[in-house]
């Protein structure tokens, strides 16, 4: 059995790879490992709007109850809400059934510990080992020792909306905002929060039917929102993904504003408020070099991690940083939540736009994005480190780096799932870096033939 858990829980095509049987086993093993020694543990269960959510929830909950835990089912709710509410309700763990930005046929199961953090690799391995060993040494409970399912009546959504609203001071009166809910988990929470803060709210893709989640909508397909913002003279647009742990924005001219710009704007604002701990933002190696240049001008440090919000969070926790995130719109505000939170991000951004008195596009001028080229080089899995070993490749990388002279960079990343290395170049001249990236990718491919 290979590793069951990926970077974001267990994911696969629902009813084919992620079966009801597997969901039952994950519920049983997860509840047993995460609540060992607790008399009558409570586990919070939420999901996004996918049609397969009901099937997987039934199976997952059966597994949880079989080891004597209580399952508190809160229904459709954003992933970051489960992270927050697990702490607020003093639950022993939280689980979300969602495949985030993936198409409808996929689903996933992701656990949070009692503090609202994603699980460590070690805990995930313990859950997998228990399943692999067919629940050896797990007692079979009967009678009154079996757990109960508790259907929650909407209080969880109310508590999460109140929490999200509390992260900004004042209201959003006078701001005209367009929201794209991706027909996903934010279709109630984000709309209500913005309305209650007195923004003028326009909404698209907020009618989930179980199969339209992420379909030509949300943060992965923001084209309709870009058009809508301009057509309706909105001050800004905000696009969520299926489980609302990420948010991208649209300025009043219809331009897509990615996570790098959001980090730059929010980082500068936190510094102004004296809340940017150690004067640092945490980004990944894939963040645009333009972000580093912009932050340097603001006398803000950038620290880089591997790609993945879990690595960003690790770095933030280790050194007590206030903000970090990815280009994709996973932004973590450690003062507020333990994971990327689309609604919290959207509210911070909207509040900054309102308070600044500037247009959103003016605020975005803080940063100039450098052209970026990404080329895949086909490389056998056992030779993915060739760029570190081969002298000619190393020499070519050094030459390119020298010629870019601080206003560009070379980044090579082996794919974790395919026989590829990704060659990424950034620089001021699109044509030049395009040629260099393709040349370097070709050199790498030729060396493994």
UniProtKB/Swiss-Prot annotation:
Its cofactor is Mg(2+). Binds 1 Mg(2+) ion per subunit. PROSITE patterns: PGM_PMM (PS00710). Its EC number is 5.4.2.10. One of its GO terms (cellular component) is cytosol. PANTHER family: PHOSPHOGLUCOMUTASE (ALPHA-D-GLUCOSE-1,6-BISPHOSPHATE-DEPENDENT), PHOSPHOHEXOSE MUTASE. NCBIfam families: glmM, PRK10887.1. Belongs to the phosphohexose mutase family. This is Phosphoglucosamine mutase. It comes from Clostridium botulinum (strain Langeland / NCTC 10281 / Type F).
């Amino acid at each position: 059995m290979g590793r069951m858990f990926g970077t974001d829980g267990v994911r696969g095509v629902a009813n084919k790879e992620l079966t009801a049987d597997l969901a039952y086993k994950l519920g049983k093993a997860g509840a047993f490992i995460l609540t060992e020694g607790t008399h009558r543990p409570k586990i919070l269960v939420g999901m996004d709007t996918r049609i397969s959510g009901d099937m997987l929830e039934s199976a997952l909950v059966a597994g949880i109850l079989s080891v004597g835990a209580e399952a508190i089912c809160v229904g459709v709710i954003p992933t970051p809400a489960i992270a927050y509410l697990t702490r607020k309700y003093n639950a022993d763990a939280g689980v979300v059934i969602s495949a985030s930005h993936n198409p409808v046929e996929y689903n996933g199961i992701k656990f949070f510990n009692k503090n609202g953090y994603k699980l460590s690799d070690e805990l995930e391995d313990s859950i997998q080992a228990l399943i692999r060993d067919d629940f050896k040494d797990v007692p079979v409970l009967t009678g009154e020792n079996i757990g109960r399912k508790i259907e929650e009546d909407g209080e969880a959504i109310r508590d999460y909306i109140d929490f999200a609203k509390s992260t900004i001071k004042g209201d959003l009166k006078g701001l005209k905002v367009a929201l794209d809910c991706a027909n996903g988990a934010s279709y109630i929470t984000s709309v209500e929060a913005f309305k209650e803060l007195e923004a003028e709210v326009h909404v698209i893709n907020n009618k989930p039917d179980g199969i339209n989640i992420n379909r030509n909508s949300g943060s992965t397909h923001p084209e309709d929102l870009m058009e809508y913002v301009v057509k309706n003279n909105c001050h800004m647009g905000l696009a969520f993904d299926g489980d609302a742990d990420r948010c991208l924005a649209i300025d009043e001219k219809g331009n897509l504003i990615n996570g790098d710009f959001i980090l730059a704007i929010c980082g500068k604002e936190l510094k102004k408020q004296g809340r940017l701990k150690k004067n640092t933002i945490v980004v990944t190696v894939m963040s645009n070099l333009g972000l580093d240049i912009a932050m340097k001008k603001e006398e803000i440090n950038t620290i880089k991690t591997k790609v993945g919000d879990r690595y960003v969070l690790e770095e933030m926790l280790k050194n007590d940083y206030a903000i970090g995130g990815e280009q994709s719109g996973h932004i973590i505000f450690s003062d507020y939540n333990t994971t990327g939170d689309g609604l919290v991000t959207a509210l911070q951004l909207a509040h900054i736009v309102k308070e600044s008195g500037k247009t959103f596009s003016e605020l975005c001028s803080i940063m100039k994005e450098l052209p970026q080229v990404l080329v895949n080089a086909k490389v056998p899995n056992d030779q993915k480190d060739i760029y570190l070993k081969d002298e000619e490749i190393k020499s070519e990388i050094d030459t390119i780096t020298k010629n870019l002279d601080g206003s560009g960079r070379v980044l090579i990343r082996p794919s974790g799932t395919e026989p590829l290395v990704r060659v990424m170049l950034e620089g001021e001249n699109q044509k030049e870096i395009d040629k260099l990236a393709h040349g370097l990718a070709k050199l790498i491919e030729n060396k493994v033939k």
